[in-house]
Design a protein with these regions (language model features):
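N-terminal, Lys/Arg-enriched amphipathic/low-complexity engagement segments
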Residues: 1-48, 98
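Short, well-structured beta-strand-loop connectors
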Residues: 50-63, 82
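Conserved hydrophobic positions within beta-strands
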Residues: 78-80
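Gly-rich Lys/Arg/Thr-decorated short loops/hinges at beta-loop-alpha junctions or inter-strand turns
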Residues: 107, 138, 161-175, 303
Length: 461
């Protein structure tokens, strides 16, 4: 039987899941946590603490800066040492709250026990409030505030919840370990999300290269169904191994056979997609009163002798993580935050983890070497590989000459930055790097036009 997958494009990089057998281990607490106020899509959070304040783990330290924004909490207990710009992994200044750790004292009311809670409250408004107050964001890469995603605009209706367990990015295994080690919590979190969305059907999508997770989640669902009807309507769907199967729009295409239009949101076709890590965080927030103060990330690479999946407090310096695992080996010449397809090079190892940090990948000179760039030979391989149906060879040309109007007309803003074009190019053209710049220009033009239209409408009132 053919396994479902998306309809256009895609590539088949080696999965390189060399850390898949590494159980999640807690990372030792950092001496200081550096917690950025901009670590989600939307407006940065606004600090609500001052230098010298004493804080506990789980205490709110920054509040949402707008409708699309999220609470941020102290990930360690101690004293607020500074609130100032600090370099992120690219070296850019980001407003950051520094907390010097003193012990590990948590806010009252947070349940840190291993006791599994299966009873889901009926009050959806209270559930949404806990998700909002817990600072829960999407942990599949986009870090979109979850409470906003669960509140569709008027006229929109969710028809299916998709829990994304594909983890198609090579090397990453934190979601796989989450499914194996916290499968019950993930399914309960999915049931909570399902209830908030009106009891819609729920599909847990897992790629075929994770048979242990597929079997385990199936068993968990069957067991929980016997306890409560709230777990009815949740199913596992085994997906074809293909990159980027875990892309939001690609997953909707594969599961629901619906295409999200240019500039549209998944809810426009009746879909809401949440990552397995987000489902786990929702369980913690709603049933354990635990805000999002830590996340699991993979540390890996063929040149790295100490493969690991670590539970890391938000704001832990990247350098501390690597030193905990023995330091950077001599043959490693580059550290990537994320995977090899969509990740970004780390220019500053003193940068700290964010809520959405998924991996640290160490690469050798041979792995990072790019062939000499040649001229485009018009082979069309990049267009064949693009899962969004774009023409990367054209977009890179328009980006080079700075034609923003043409970039927008050719849907540069729809690029999901998956890297399939770069992976497929025989001329070694850095398509993704160039298109990213053009996409940023197109998005800026779209935002400026929307702001101008809004201002004109306000003035006309």
């Amino acid at each position: 039987m053919r396994k479902p997958t998306f309809s256009i494009g895609g590539v088949h990089p080696h999965d390189s899941k060399i850390s898949r057998e590494c159980r999640v281990e807690p990372m030792p607490l950092p001496d200081s946590a550096y917690i950025a106020v901009a670590q989600h899509i939307g407006a940065p959070a606004k600090p609500i603490v001052a230098v010298g304040d004493k804080v506990k783990v789980g205490q709110p330290i920054a509040e949402p800066g707008g409708f699309v924004s999220a609470f941020i909490h102290a990930s360690v207990s101690g004293t607020v040492k500074s609130i100032a710009p600090r370099a992120d992994l690219a070296g850019n200044p980001v407003m950051t709250i520094e907390i010097a750790r003193e012990g590990d004292e948590w806010m009252e009311g947070i349940d840190l026990s291993d006791t599994l809670v299966t009873e889901i409250p009926d009050d959806n408004k209270a559930i949404l409030d806990k998700i909002r107050l817990g600072g829960i964001v999407g942990l599949g890469g986009a870090t979109f505030p979850t409470h906003v995603k669960l509140s569709p605009p008027p006229g929109s209706k969710c028809e299916r919840l998709i829990i994304n367990g594909c983890e198609c990015e090579p090397y990453l295994t934190s979601d796989f370990r989450c499914l194996l080690e916290k499968g019950e919590q993930v399914v309960i979190g999915a049931a909570i999300l399902k209830q908030v969305l009106g009891g819609v059907p729920c599909t847990v999508a897992i790629e075929e290269n994770k048979p242990e997770a597929i079997a385990h989640i199936g068993e968990v669902i069957a067991r929980l169904r016997k306890q409560s009807p709230k777990f009815d309507g949740i199913e596992v769907m085994v997906m074809k191994m293909r990159y980027p199967q875990g892309g939001e729009k690609q997953l909707i295409d594969a599961v629901m056979h619906r295409q999200v239009g240019s500039g549209a949101l998944p809810i426009s076709v009746g879909a809401v997609v949440q990552n397995v890590g987000t489902a786990l965080a929702v369980y913690d927030a709603v049933l354990k009163n635990k805000p999002l103060v830590d996340n699991t990330l993979t540390v890996t690479g063929e040149c790295f002798p100490h493969q690991a999946n670590l539970l890391v407090r938000v704001g832990t310096p990247l350098r501390a993580i690597l030193e905990h695992l023995g330091g950077i080996p001599d043959e490693a010449v580059k550290v990537i935050s994320g995977g090899p397809m969509m990740g970004k090079a780390v220019a500053n190892l003193d940068a700290a983890t964010l809520k959405g940090t998924s991996a640290l990948l160490l690469l050798t000179e041979k792995q990072t070497a790019r062939g000499e760039e040649g001229p485009c030979i018009r082979c069309g391989k990049c267009a064949e590989a693009c899962p969004m149906g774009l023409e990367p060879f054209l977009l890179q040309k328009l980006s080079r000459i700075g034609d923003v109007e043409a970039l927008e007309a050719n849907a540069a803003q729809d690029c999901i930055e998956c890297g399939c074009c770069l992976y497929s190019c025989p001329a070694n053209i850095p398509l993704l790097d160039i298109i990213r710049l053009g996409k940023a220009d197109a998005m800026k033009a779209i935002r400026e036009r929307a702001a101008a239209a809004k201002a004109a409408a306000e003035a006309a009132k």
